[in-house]
Every structure is written in structure tokens, then in C-alpha cells.
Amino acid sequence: DCNVIVGENAQGKTNLLEAIVYLSSARSPRARAEKELISFGKSECSIKANAFARNRDFLLEIALAAGRRRKILINKVPVKKGSDLSDVLGAVYFCPEDLLLIRDGAAARRKFMDDALCQLRARYAQALSDYHRAYEHKTRILRDSEEYPSLLDTLPEFDLRMAQSGAVIIYYRARFCERLKEYAGIAHRECSGGREELGVEY
């Protein structure tokens, strides 16, 4: 089956697609920060949807409020990880901006892999979260160490955490690129009539 969404400009077609993707991963394909998902002048927002997967019905809900942690519920039961949503609702989002994967820098390609792997592998999503958390702690330590030199004694702990979670991230990204090369290579050969070979390196 195919559903086609039509409407005038600024009626919310893209917002609807963004909402579906957000309910599948708790990651927005457009917004850089969750606060951008809340309407201007408002302090909170929520989104919910019914989904049918694994021969049963699911109710997916996410609530955001300024200054508070988001709430994710599956069938009214709170869950901690956004990756739990992808076990129920999988989504692939494609838009014209995806062409920037080729034209933009490495950051755009890393985000592409992060968005895909966070849906495919819960362990990757956890490692990515752990890495960012350790990085933020380390940044604060370095920033405040001039006033509190003893903070530098805690750096090795966060270096270790970043190394451990970073190793998991690198492992999954490398495997992802191997599979991407395999499947994208087949599609590229068909598009080029067998005259070109696509290469993917990480």
C-alpha cells in the first residue's frame, strides 16, 4: 500500500512526516535540539500514535516540556531509551537535503549513520549517548579546572569512558559501511548500466 499526503504550502505535510520519524526513534530529522520541536510561545508539546506491529497494537507517546526531561511511553509504560521505539515502529526518512551527504562535510555523514544505527542497534544508541555524556563532562572539567585544579584528577575516568563507548561506535559504523557498500553498490551498478563501481570507505 502507498499513502500520498497532499496539501497546500505550510499546512504541515513535512511536520507530519517528522512526527512519524520522531516516534520511531526519538530523534528529529530536522531539529537540532528538542526545544525546537515545541511551538513558539508554548512551553510543552506531545505526540502520540497507534501502531500495529508483531501482531499486536501499540500506543506510542512522547511528551516534551521546557526545562524537563522528555517522557517516552509505550502502551502507557515509561521507557528510558528512544531506541525502544524503533522495535515497534521503523521508519526511513528521505528528503532533498539528503544530497548534502555528498556535498557537505563528514558531520552530515556521521549524523546519517547515527540516525540509522540508533534505530537498528540499541547498543549503538546507548554507546552514542554514553560517549556524548562523557564528552560533556570532560569539557566541563577542562573549563573549570583553572578554578578547581583537582578536577583534572577525574579526567582519566572520562577518557576511559569515551574510549570504551567510542570503540563500540567505530565497530558498528565500520560494519554499517560494509553493508552499505554491498547494497548501494548493487543499486549503483544498475543505475550506471554496469559501467561504474561505487566505493564506500570509513
Feature annotation, model-predicted:
Residues 19-20, 90-93, 159:
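Short hydrophobic/aromatic segments of transmembrane alpha-helices and their interfaces
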Residues 7, 25, 193:
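Short, conserved catalytic or interaction motifs in soluble domains
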Residues 100-194, 198-201:
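An accessory alpha-helical subdomain
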Residues 1-22:
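Pre-Walker A-like glycine/lysine-rich segment at the N-terminus of P-loop NTPase domains
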